[in-house]
UniProtKB/Swiss-Prot annotation:
Protein's name according to its UniProt entry: Probable cytochrome P450 304a1
Entry's family note: Belongs to the cytochrome P450 family.
Organism expressing this protein natively: Drosophila melanogaster (Fruit fly)
Entry EC no(s): 1.14.-.-
Superkingdom as given in the UniProt entry: Eukaryota
Function: May be involved in the metabolism of insect hormones and in the breakdown of synthetic insecticides.
UniProt-recorded Gene Ontology molecular function terms: heme binding; iron ion binding; monooxygenase activity; oxidoreductase activity, acting on paired donors, with incorporation or reduction of molecular oxygen
GO cellular component: endoplasmic reticulum membrane
């Protein structure tokens, strides 16, 4: 009898403690789903929408009738915000400028130290970001720079030659079929974007013959992007899972990608370290190395330079090509939009030269179409996660220090209170009554905002415009034998949204 009573009491205590653990949350924390040991609320999100966690979070927000929800991803408390005011508050308030120390970020470094810019915070982040941006600007980063525009034009001419005449070198067969006009997206765009970006950093570009290295870099970069998710995947919750299920957990592909990308940039750094001459400034690399050699200054060392280069270059060899490919999907699904873009380019630019940045002001519908593509298919739906640097409040709720804070850019870009018809691909929303581009109408945030604003926004917008205008000027996007129109529901969710690799048939317009 006593034994049965004790067992009953123990079971009751266990159930009570389990219930309190599951529903318990810090005082004043936003409403949200219960948590279970080890996984927190992560499994609930997977059940709601296994493929798109940003959509699962928005579903929870609607269930709880709150623009902010609180949950746990493993041991980490997380606040996800879905309102315009809340998203802007996170992006512009420096108290949310921290970065959580997730395993996916730490694994990029051999010693699992978080270096670089993306996943760094505190004095090191501020110092490195300020220094790199200051001196990269001298070489054309973040501003109009005539020489860089000429380099981009050379890259576009090389891309057009590859498309029309087919591969010349072995690595080009991975991007274009023999005979030309059938191209693999998103891979085609990224090496040329990366090569233009390399001119900023190294003051040189690779020749087409040498670009096999860039093709592999782009493939590995996209592989890394596709094998994580908004919240660091299961690897950031239980890192030891990589020892049991290295393939299923995504660790093998993440690690393969990371090792290749890091070694690629390490080789460049060592090349310039070995050839450095004091007082000779060939490019940004020499500027940074000179700072390293002034003494053991805070953060200026070989490993930090490697990861800084990875972070500043990563969007150029992954995100730009992916965003262009997402836009191609929409142009194929909305042929009337494509025709209007092409007609505008024909009228303003003609076919005797490539479009340039001076044409942008005279191509408002083309620019509006690119901006609508950035809005409707948010590349980074949950932004890069932020972290509260101190106890604070957000939308009336208490946010403890070290809470992961997620501004849902996807929710912002699909909010009917802002866009009225967010599900519609409608570039006209950014034009005024006279058909001119009206920047006041574009409140989208595809590159974030505040101190964490994507440093490559200017370069990315310029590349998106020049590549889009060039492709639409020269080609129609048609369906080849056995091709189907893009199915947007098949797009992949990782650190970014990306289309699965697909072959696109092109047809000359002139």
């Amino acid at each position: 009898m006593i034994t049965e009573t004790l067992l009953t009491i123990c079971a009751a205590v266990f159930l009570c403690l389990s219930y309190r653990y599951a529903v318990g949350r810090p005082s004043g924390f936003p409403p949200g789903p219960p948590k279970i040991p080890l996984f927190g609320s992560y499994l609930f999100m997977l059940i709601i929408n296994f493929k798109y966690l940003h959509k699962a979070a928005l579903t929870l927000s609607r269930w709880y009738k709150s623009d902010i929800i609180g949950l746990h991803v493993g041991p980490f408390p997380v606040a996800v915000v879905h309102s315009a005011d809340g998203v802007r508050e996170i992006l512009n308030n420096q108290v949310f400028d921290g970065r959580p120390q997730l395993f996916v970020a730490a694994m990029r470094d051999p010693g699992q130290d978080v270096r670089g810019i993306f996943f760094q915070d505190g004095p090191l982040w501020k110092e490195q970001r300020r220094f790199i941006l200051r001196y990269l600007r001298d070489f054309g980063f973040g501003r109009r720079f005539d020489q860089l525009e000429l380099v981009i034009q050379e890259q576009l001419n090389d891309m057009l030659d590859l498309i029309r005449n087919g591969p010349k070198y072995p690595h080009e067969h991975e991007m274009v079929k023999s005979g030309g006009y059938r191209v693999l997206l998103p891979l085609l765009f990224n090496p040329f974007s990366a090569n233009a970006h390399f001119y900023i950093v190294y003051n040189e570009c690779l020749s087409r013959e040498e670009m096999g290295k860039l093709v592999k870099l782009c493939q590995m970069g996209i592989q890394f992007q596709r094998n994580a998710d908004d919240y660091g995947k299961m690897l950031s919750i239980i890192p030891w899972i990589r020892h049991i299920w290295p393939e299923w957990s995504g660790y093998n592909k993440l690690n393969e990608s990371n090792l290749f990308v890091r070694q690629f940039f390490a080789d460049f750094v060592d090349k310039y370290l070995d050839s450095y001459e004091e007082g000779v400034e060939r490019n940004f690399m020499d500027v940074y190395i000179a700072e390293m050699r002034r003494g053991p200054g805070y953060g200026f060392n070989r490993d930090q330079l490697i990861m800084g280069l990875v972070d500043f270059s990563f969007p150029a060899f992954t995100a730009i090509g992916v965003q262009l490919s997402l836009l191609v999907q929409y142009l194929m699904l909305y042929p009337a939009v494509l025709r209007r873009v092409q007609n505008e380019i024909d009228e303003v630019v003609g076919c005797g030269r490539l479009p340039n940045l001076e044409d942008r002001k005279n191509l408002p519908f083309t620019e509006a179409t690119i901006r609508e593509g950035l809005r409707i298919e948010t590349l980074v739906p949950s932004d890069v996660p932020h972290k509260a640097l101190e106890d604070t409040e957000l939308l009336g709720y208490r946010i403890p220090k070290d809470t992961i804070v997620v501004p849902s850019l996807y929710a912002f870009h699909s909010d009917a209170r802002i866009w009225s018809d967010p599900e519609q691909f409608r570039p006209e929303r950014f034009l005024d009554a006279d058909g001119k581009l009206c920047l006041k109408l574009d409140v989208s945030l595809p590159f974030g905002a505040g101190k964490r604003l994507c440093a490559g926004e200017t370069f990315a917008r310029n590349m998106l415009f020049l590549v889009t205008a060039t492709m639409c000027q020269h080609f129609d996007f048609v369906l080849g034998p056995n091709d189907r129109l893009p199915d947007l529901s098949q797009n992949l969710n990782g650190l970014i949204i990306s289309p699965p690799d697909f072959w696109l048939q092109l047809q000359d317009r002139h």
